[in-house]
């Protein structure tokens, strides 16, 4: 089972001296529309292909998110990362919808995949 975190926990982690790698588990078109600041795009169905380039350090802190609490992409991606040997994987279950509802900033633009 994945470790889930709240918006406040994510905000604290992102403001820390060693912020986690933030990965959006949605397809590129949704990432381009909006994503959390500093996030990289790793669709849930491309984890095995993209993880080595996006997250070469398997011990690094990683937070995965997707659209909202009902979206399962982040949970699927987290399980796949764990299966690949990543040891510090968390899921921001509220996702983009929760972040935007709180009035927090998002970025737009093309998917950074490496």
Give residue spans per PLM region.
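Rhodanese-like catalytic fold shared by cysteine-dependent sulfurtransferases
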Residues: 1-21, 25-64, 68-114
């Amino acid at each position: 089972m994945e470790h889930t975190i709240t918006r406040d926990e994510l905000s604290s982690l992102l403001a820390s001296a060693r912020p986690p790698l933030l990965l959006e588990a949605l397809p590129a078109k949704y990432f381009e529309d909006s994503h959390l600041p500093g996030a990289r795009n790793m669709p849930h169905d491309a984890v095995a292909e993209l993880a080595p380039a996006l997250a070469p350090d398997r011990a690094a802190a990683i937070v995965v998110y997707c659209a909202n609490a009902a979206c399962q992409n982040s949970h699927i991606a987290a399980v796949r990362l764990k299966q690949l040997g990543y040891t510090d994987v968390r899921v921001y279950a509220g996702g983009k919808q929760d972040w935007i509802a709180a009035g927090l900033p998002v970025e737009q633009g093309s998917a950074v995949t490496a």
